[in-house]
Regions:
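Bacterial carbohydrate/catabolite-sensing allosteric modules
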Residues: 2-4, 40-49, 94-102, 106-300
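Alpha-helical recognition/docking segments in bacterial nutrient-uptake
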Residues: 2, 6-10, 14-127, 195
Length: 300
């Protein structure tokens, strides 16, 4: 439902504000390191085009921060992030005729977007581990809240993981994990409790990564001698853990740059066909994966 205030957005010519709205809700109680990387890169790229960036939250169309941004007519266009498969924020922007782009991908494609091929990356991580001899692998996803809300990367990444283990005849389990180190440690404990034969983890939860490592240390599993970890995270964060994480590095700077470029294109030619950019970075082999070492049995 469009309020009377917002319905007047395109009723009359408007002067350009030379500002972009960035609608980016934090993953949990605070922004993760990867999210902060995106915010900084988007602001830097927008500045190069002569635009300021107004950051606000709002994961749903009815959330007050999102409503205030639109009702105030403070921006020329909107960049949406933390995309859900069925994203009512995008639906509202389309209904209002407000130029917008996605960093992410919704189920219904109404505008330009840039995204990672999370499904393919999930499969790539499984193949990397399978090539090292791992047969029992766990997938550590994002939080239950994000998954149940339809968070697109969580769903696509898990679909790719499941497809990968199925195609290769491996044993795989999936786990939802809150975005913090304590949750990562608890998740790792649960993984080993439910299947002690697990020798590797694929993760998309960079905020829980330190906890996964801590849990492995507590369990007496050395990385990568006894246990391998591979993920999809931003490169700087993969390099901050010890041993450094083998990962498909999320190109936050490139995705941010492309997102702003797509926004500029929408502002210049709003009636042009939308453009879609799908990125699939290669796995960067660092120090957290190695050949599978069989898990000793209880009598060993």
């Amino acid at each position: 439902m469009i309020s009377g205030e917002m319905s007047r957005w395109t009723d009359a010519p408007r002067e350009r504000t030379h500002a972009l709205g960035l609608v980016f809700p934090p993953a949990g109680d605070h922004y993760t390191g990867m999210q902060l990387d995106f915010i900084g890169a988007i602001a830097e790229t927008a500045q190069a085009y002569g635009y300021d960036v107004l950051l606000t939250t709002g994961s749903k169309a009815g959330d007050h921060p999102f409503q205030r941004l639109l009702a105030g007519r403070l921006v020329d266009g909107v960049i949406l992030m933390e995309i859900q498969l069925d994203d009512d924020r995008a639906d509202l922007l389309s209904e209002l005729g407000i130029p917008y782009v996605l960093i992410g991908r919704a189920r219904v494609e109404k505008t330009s977007w840039v995204n990672l091929d999370f499904a393919a990356l999930g499969r790539d991580c499984v193949r990397h581990l399978a090539d090292l001899g791992h047969r029992t692998i766990a997938f550590v996803n994002r939080s239950e809240h994000l998954f149940r809300s339809g968070y697109q990367s969580a769903h696509l990444g898990q679909e790719g993981f499941v497809r990968g283990v199925t195609e290769l005849g491996l044993t795989g389990r999936t786990y939802l994990c809150d975005d913090d180190a304590a949750a990562g440690e608890a998740c790792l404990e649960r993984i080993l409790l439910e299947d002690p034969a697990t020798t590797a983890v694929v993760t998309m939860n960079e905020a829980g990564l330190g906890g996964l490592y801590r849990g492995l240390k507590r369990a007496g599993r050395a990385v990568p001698r006894d246990f391998s970890v591979v993920g999809v995270v931003a490169g700087p964060w993969a390099e901050r853990v010890t041993p450094q994480l083998t990962a498909a590095d999320m190109p936050a700077a490139e995705m941010s740059r492309v997102g702003v470029e797509l926004m500029m294109e929408r502002l210049k030619a709003p009636d042009a066909p939308p453009r879609h950019v799908l990125l699939r970075p290669l796995i960067c082999t660092r120090d957290s994966t190695g050949p599978c070492k069989p898990v000793p049995g209880p009598d060993s």
